Amino acid sequence: AMRMFRAKFRASVAALIFNEQGQVLLFKHTYRKFEWGIPAGGLEYGEQPDKAILREFFEETGMQIEIERLLLAESSKEDRNISIVYLCRIVSGSFQESNEISEMKYFDVNDLPRMLFAEKDLIRWAADNL
C-alpha cells in the first residue's frame, strides 16, 4: 500500500523560452536581490503544473505562451521544492509590465546577467540538450 507522507512540499513551475538565435528569455524582477531570472511561479492549490506556468506568464506579462515539452521535473530535499520546467514558446500578446516584472529580455546563454547559479546551470544544461 502507498504510504501517505505528510512532508509539505512546495511546487514551482518555470518556463524556458529560446528565440531563433538560441538566446534565453529572462524577466527582470522588482523584488529580488538578483533581479534577472527565468519566468517561474508557484502552483495554486489543486492547480495542474502545465496550467500554472501559462497562468503565471500571462499574469506577469499579459502574453500567452504554449508548452512545447516538459524539460525537467525534480525534487530537492534541501528546500523541499519540486521544480517543474517546461520548454515553451510565446504565442501572442505584447509585453506589459506588472508589479513583479519590470522588463523582459533575451540574453546569450554565454553572457547571462547576475542571477541564481541554479538558474544559470539549468539554462546552460537546456541549451546544450535542445
Residue ranges of predicted features:
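Acidic, metal-coordinating catalytic segment for phosphate/diphosphate chemistry
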Residues: 1-14
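Residue-level preference for beta-strand/loop junctions
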Residues: 9, 34, 80-82
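A structural signal for short, well-ordered beta-strand segments
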Residues: 13-15, 70, 86-88
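Conserved Nudix-box catalytic region and its N-terminal flanking loop in Nudix hydrolases
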Residues: 19-59
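Nudix hydrolase/Nudix homology domain
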Residues: 34-36, 99-130
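A short coil-to-beta-strand element that immediately follows conserved catalytic motifs
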Residues: 63-72
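Active-site-adjacent beta-strand/loop module that shapes the phosphate/pyrophosphate-binding cleft
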Residues: 74-95, 105, 126-130
